[in-house]
Amino acid sequence: MTSKSLNAWVIHKQWSGDTSARLKLFTRELGLINCLCKGGRTPKKQSLLQAFIPLWVSIEERYDQYYTRNIESTSSRLDLEGHSLFSGLYINELLYYTLSPDFPDSDLFDAYLFTLNGIALAREREAIEALLRRFEWALLKACGYTFSFLHEARTGELIVPDSHYQFVAGEGFILGGDKKIPGEHLLAIAADNLSESAYLKSAKFIMRQAIDHLLGGREIKARSLYGPA
């Protein structure tokens, strides 16, 4: 039996029996894990086992199953409402459906923290949209699914600002095609320049297709709440 202490966020919760809760936690140390919290229905634990509360969780592993030993909050719940709330639910669903269990990635964990704190503070929708696009790219990288914004996918030639390209999921950008994206936009996105609404719109279009390819047909319910992506 091994015991570990983790920085964690609740991604999903399901009641189990009369007293327990089955949790899916996103942690810095172990990545996404499934964990059984005995006594999870007590008022104290119910107040902690919510999304968007940073937690310090002590767990033990028995017979390939994680069990919580102690749960504490390290700060108050993030103040998310409206579009910020739906965006937070969106990125939680992305983690739930795309990450393999027990695969830690500190860069993705940091991106998650940065995004949550950013959307909690953001007052404009475009600022939230930019944060979501950057998180989606971090998630794609963590899942090993990346493509170049600087080179044409099939020839390897440099993207030309005045040319137009089509995004092909699983490949990248090819010259021409029906749904054309200006090369200027691709180069701006490559430079992390989402300051122009046109660049942000193209980034949203590209990431939507890339994320859908990664999801493999699984539905993200938060999209229907407010259309964050």
From Swiss-Prot:
InterPro entries hit by this protein: DNA_rep/recomb_RecO_N, NA-bd_OB-fold, RecO, RecO_C
Signal peptide stretch: none
Keywords from the named record: DNA damage, DNA recombination, DNA repair
Any one Gene Ontology cellular component term annotated for this protein: bacterial nucleoid
Coiled coil regions in record: none
Example GO biological process: DNA recombination
Protein purpose: Involved in DNA repair and RecF pathway recombination.
Protein family per UniProt: Belongs to the RecO family.
Full protein name: DNA repair protein RecO
Organism of derivation: Legionella pneumophila (strain Paris)
Organismal lineage: Bacteria, Pseudomonadati, Pseudomonadota, Gammaproteobacteria, Legionellales
Gene that encodes it: recO
